[in-house]
């Protein structure tokens, strides 16, 4: 059978722009996988191309067969003893089973036997006719539509009195072509497959666009319909035009980089045309973050930055039309953006009439959580925690700076600008703090206390920012855990996982001399009797986040488990411990010592009572135990010294010298001796060994 390429296009009204790419990939992907599962692809070389524009979802699939190949099927029926009587004739049960398969009694002669003895069974062989392409596409199309990731569907009628159709947007056309042939009878959403689609609403050369063949689809839409059907091609064209427009302006200007905005604009236009617009320079007195946000979020414009990263008074618009005279389009966009910028300027001017300090009282009217009080109460807790952290770091001056920053950190929440643009919280606080004449370190801390906001985000710039950011995140974590408001599954409305990672990153990357569990407990007094003490559960939660983060960095699960099993309190030490464990794992002595360490741990766990790491040299009897004791006396102090100095790699490598005496001990010494004094002394020797071996990590976790 000759294979041809297949095209399936669903023509619809404008799709949700933020979901377009996902919808396009899902639609095409399910079609491809369904056809593959039905055996309708001629080879493993078949390729899929997904198309997605504001008004269409389509898939082009190569090497599609007109009919799947027939299949020989062998089906087990029943044991021979059940299907045939003593004379070898078919039983009623066998006749009934064959009838269910559409076969008569004459099929008995063609049955085969497989197996031996009681396991011998009868098998019926038949040929299953391969599915026809039209039927296969119908099934695949139904599945693709059913599985589209649509958060909300519309209900509509194709004509008055017709039954309702449910889909993300009303559909108006269906094209299904196998080569040049329409697959007759394929239907979807009340539509029947044909060859006609539609191009650009205003600039198509012909309407409808009649697709000649599956392979002509993209080219015909571009030439006759003025549509770039491929999402990727359209995106690349927009990026190219944005860069070209900026270069024509000169002066080193460049469009702001925003991948999400580029994706959204790609989903809004079918044939992009980038135009240069501008606004009055007086608006540049407003913080550029405000102007950039309103242009991007509200208007989908691309602001232009100069070589120094400062906002210019020009911006780029991606239009869906390409008139000979674009002045009307440019003027319209400039008129639309002007009121937005004027609002931002008004908010900025009004907000600066009040100091941040005068807004603190207003936070008492903003509810934070019904069990944890208002933002005003929360601010007082963060202040208390920040001062406690600064004291633990031994810096009185830092405590004063952090206290002021913590007091004012949330005050921009009650400003007009942040009320309009919540994304600017912290950013506007910094601008208003500088306007009030506050120290730059305090202003930076106000902005930075939200950092890191996401994975890979930068950390606070100064020490005050780090202290307030830590205090803010710890207040959230301890408070939420204390009222039992824990993340479950995908639900994490208070971003506790992100806050935990933020705490980890600051403790590690800023190399803070703070013990984790001491730090968590120090937060509790700020809450009084509002919450339960859930710091043990919170510590587990943080260690779990740390473990996941370390595995993502490339450390093995065994390496991570070995270090975190000891629950090291200085998280800034964890990386060094892991590097030491990795270096130790490369030593030839490592496997034997890890296995021995595991054995020692098991022996000590099974001891009748708690074993102290004490050895009486006079009680030692066997040569092997004396040798191990002597080796420990020689090696352990040096390893302990290196550990105390933070040289974990050297400490573990020093301990590698214990391999031979440890092996000899287990080969020649009976730990559970009949003499109680001898047994206790040997257990004490093993406890001493265990203590020496497990300062950096629990090496037993490295055992195979």
Swiss-Prot record:
Reaction(s) catalysed by this chain's protein: tRNA(Gly) + glycine + ATP = glycyl-tRNA(Gly) + AMP + diphosphate
Protein name: Glycine--tRNA ligase beta subunit
Subunit and partners: Tetramer of two alpha and two beta subunits.
Source organism of the structure: Delftia acidovorans (strain DSM 14801 / SPH-1)
Gene that specifies this protein: glyS
Compartments it resides in: Cytoplasm
Record GO cellular component, one term: cytosol
A biological-process GO annotation: arginyl-tRNA aminoacylation
A Pfam family this chain is assigned to: DALR_1
Principal subcellular localization: cytoplasm
Family: Belongs to the class-II aminoacyl-tRNA synthetase family.
GO molecular function annotations of the record: arginine-tRNA ligase activity; ATP binding; glycine-tRNA ligase activity
Keywords: Aminoacyl-tRNA synthetase, ATP-binding, Cytoplasm, Ligase, Nucleotide-binding, Protein biosynthesis
Enzyme Commission code: 6.1.1.14
């Amino acid at each position: 059978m000759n294979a041809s390429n297949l095209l399936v296009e669903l023509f619809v009204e404008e799709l949700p722009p933020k979901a377009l790419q996902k919808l396009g990939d899902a639609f095409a992907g399910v079609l491809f996988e369904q056809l593959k599962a039905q055996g309708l692809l001629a080879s493993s070389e078949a390729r899929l191309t997904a198309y997605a524009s504001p008004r269409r979802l389509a898939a082009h699939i190569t090497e599609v067969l007109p009919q799947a190949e027939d299949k020989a099927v062998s089906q087990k029926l029943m044991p021979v003893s059940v299907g045939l009587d003593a004379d070898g004739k078919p039983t009623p049960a066998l006749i009934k089973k064959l009838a269910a398969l559409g076969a008569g009694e004459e099929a008995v002669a063609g049955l085969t036997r497989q197996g031996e003895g009681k396991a011998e069974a009868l098998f019926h062989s038949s040929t299953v006719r391969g599915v026809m392409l039209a039927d296969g596409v119908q099934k695949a199309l139904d599945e693709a539509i059913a599985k589209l990731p649509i958060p909300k569907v519309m209900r509509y009628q194709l004509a008055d009195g017709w039954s309702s159709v449910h889909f993300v947007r009303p559909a108006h056309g269906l094209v299904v072509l196998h080569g040049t042939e329409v697959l007759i009878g394929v239907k979807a959403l009340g539509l029947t497959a044909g060859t006609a689609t539609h191009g650009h609403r205003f600039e198509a050369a012909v309407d409808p666009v009649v697709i000649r063949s599956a392979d002509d689809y993209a080219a015909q839409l571009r030439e006759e319909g003025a549509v770039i059907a491929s999402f990727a091609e359209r995106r690349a064209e927009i990026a190219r035009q944005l860069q070209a427009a900026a270069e024509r302006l000169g002066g080193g200007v460049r469009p702001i980089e925003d991948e999400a905005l580029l994706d959204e604009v790609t989903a809004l236009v079918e044939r992009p045309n980038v135009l240069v617009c501008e606004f009055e320079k007086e608006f540049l007195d407003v913080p550029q973050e405000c102007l950039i946000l309103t242009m991007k979020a509200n208007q989908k414009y691309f602001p232009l930055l100069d070589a120094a990263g400062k906002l210019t008074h020009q911006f780029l618009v991606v239009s869906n039309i390409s008139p000979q005279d674009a002045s009307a389009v440019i003027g319209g966009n400039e008129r639309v953006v002007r009121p937005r910028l004027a609002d931002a300027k008004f908010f900025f001017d009004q907000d600066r009439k009040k100091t941040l300090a005068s807004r603190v009282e207003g936070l008492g009217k903003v509810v934070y959580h019904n069990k944890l009080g208002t933002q005003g109460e929360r601010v007082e807790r963060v202040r208390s925690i920040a001062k406690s952290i600064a004291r633990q770091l031994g810096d009185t001056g830092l405590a004063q700076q952090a206290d002021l920053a913590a007091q004012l950190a949330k005050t921009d929440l009650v400003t007009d600008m942040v009320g309009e643009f919540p994304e600017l919280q912290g950013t506007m606080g910094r601008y208003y703090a500088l306007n009030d004449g506050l120290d730059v370190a305090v202003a930076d801390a106000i902005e930075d206390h939200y950092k890191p906001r996401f994975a890979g985000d930068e950390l606070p710039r100064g020490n005050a920012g780090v202290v307030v950011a830590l205090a803010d995140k710890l207040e959230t974590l301890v408070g939420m855990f204390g009222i039992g408001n824990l993340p479950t599954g995908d639900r994490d409305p208070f971003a506790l996982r992100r806050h935990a990672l933020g705490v980890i990153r600051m403790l590690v990357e800023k190399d803070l001399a703070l013990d984790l569990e001491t730090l968590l407990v120090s937060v509790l007094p700020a809450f009084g009797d509002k919450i339960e003490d859930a710091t043990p559960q919170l510590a587990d939660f943080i260690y779990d986040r740390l473990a996941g983060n370390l595995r993502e960095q490339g450390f093995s699960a065994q390496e991570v488990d070995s270090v975190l099993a000891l629950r090291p309190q200085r998280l800034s030490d964890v990386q060094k411990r892991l590097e030491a464990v990795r270096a130790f794992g490369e030593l030839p002595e490592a496997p034997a010592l890890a296995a021995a360490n595991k054995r020692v741990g098991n022996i000590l766990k099974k001891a009748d009572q708690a074993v102290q790491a004490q050895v009486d040299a006079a009680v030692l009897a066997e040569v092997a135990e004396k040798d191990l004791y002597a080796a420990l006396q020689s090696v352990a102090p040096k390893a302990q010294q290196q550990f105390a100095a933070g040289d974990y790699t050297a400490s573990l490598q020093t301990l590698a010298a214990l391999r031979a005496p440890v092996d000899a001990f287990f080969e020649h010494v009976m730990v559970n001796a009949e003499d109680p004094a001898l047994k206790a002394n040997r257990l004490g020797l093993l406890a001493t060994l265990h203590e020496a071996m497990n300062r950096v990590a629990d090496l037993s976790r490295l055992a195979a």
